[in-house]
Design a protein with these regions (language model features):
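Residues at the C-terminal ends
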Residues: 16, 107, 168, 194-195
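Conserved thiamine diphosphate
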Residues: 3-8, 12-150, 155-158, 173
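A glycine- and small/hydrophobic-rich beta-loop-beta segment
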Residues: 140, 167, 191-192
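Short beta->alpha junction loops
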Residues: 2, 176-182
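Glycine-rich, anion-gripping cofactor-binding loops and their flanking helix/strand elements
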Residues: 182-205
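Short, glycine/polar-rich helix-capping loops at beta-to-alpha or helix-loop-helix junctions
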Residues: 73-78, 163, 184-188
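Hydrophobic, well-ordered secondary-structure elements that form the walls
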Residues: 149, 166, 177, 200
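Short helix-loop-beta junction
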Residues: 158-176
Length: 205
């Protein structure tokens, strides 16, 4: 049966039993049906047990609009999950990050949510490395001195396109791909803002 509450519950049980399951709930909208399992069990159990138990489950969910997927398949709820203690929230924008982040997530002792924008699903690319990706830092995708554009996931290509158009007008921008929504890499953002003194945030959520 289609039961996101059940899928995530089974994943949590498997994680507690020593496995490292990957649960796919198709779209972020339907993850709301599993919110109790995610918030009250997966995210909280390590802290409730003083570290005696961990829940190394990875939950993948598609997010984002613009693909004619109807109202129940196109929400962007990653900002909700980014406010839940005990969860790491990842948002890959490239094929390499989508692969590498999943590899790294499978080594985490805590639950990881990967919000995957639907726009890049049809992208293909050669991977330079099959190694896990560092999920503790944002990535500077373009260098500039006049403004900082901060984006993540499916908004990163749009931010890069905008930066290219601005460059033609003589405005050079840093483009930061957050990559990790929780915990945020404040240091990378602040370093850029201290240089440019101007910030534009591109965000569907």
């Amino acid at each position: 049966p289609i039961s996101e509450l059940g899928f995530v519950g089974i994943g949590i049980g498997a994680a507690l039993g020593g496995l490292r399951p990957i649960v796919e709930v198709m779209t972020v909208n339907f993850s709301l049906l599993a919110l109790d399992q995610i918030v009250n069990t997966a995210a909280a159990l390590r802290h409730m047990s003083s570290g005696q138990f961990s829940v190394p489950v990875v939950v993948r969910m598609a997010t984002g609009a613009g693909r004619q997927l109807a109202a129940q398949h196109s929400h962007s709820l990653e900002n909700w999950y980014a406010h839940i203690p005990g969860i790491t929230v990842l948002a890959p924008a490239t094929v390499a990050d989508a692969y590498g982040m999943l590899r790294t997530a499978l080594t985490s002792p805590d639950p990881v949510i990967i919000v995957e924008h639907v726009a890049p699903y049809n992208l293909a690319a050669e991977l330079d490395s099959l190694a896990p990706t560092d999920i503790s830092r944002a990535a500077l995708r373009r260098n500039g001195t006049d403004a900082t554009i901060i984006a993540y996931g499916g908004c990163v290509p749009k931010a890069l396109d905008a930066a290219e158009q601005l460059a033609q007008a003589g405005i050079e921008c840093d483009v930061i791909d957050l990559r990790v929504l929780r915990p945020l890499d404040d240091a990378t953002m602040m370093e850029s803002v201290r240089k440019t003194h101007r910030v534009v945030v591109v965000d569907e959520a």
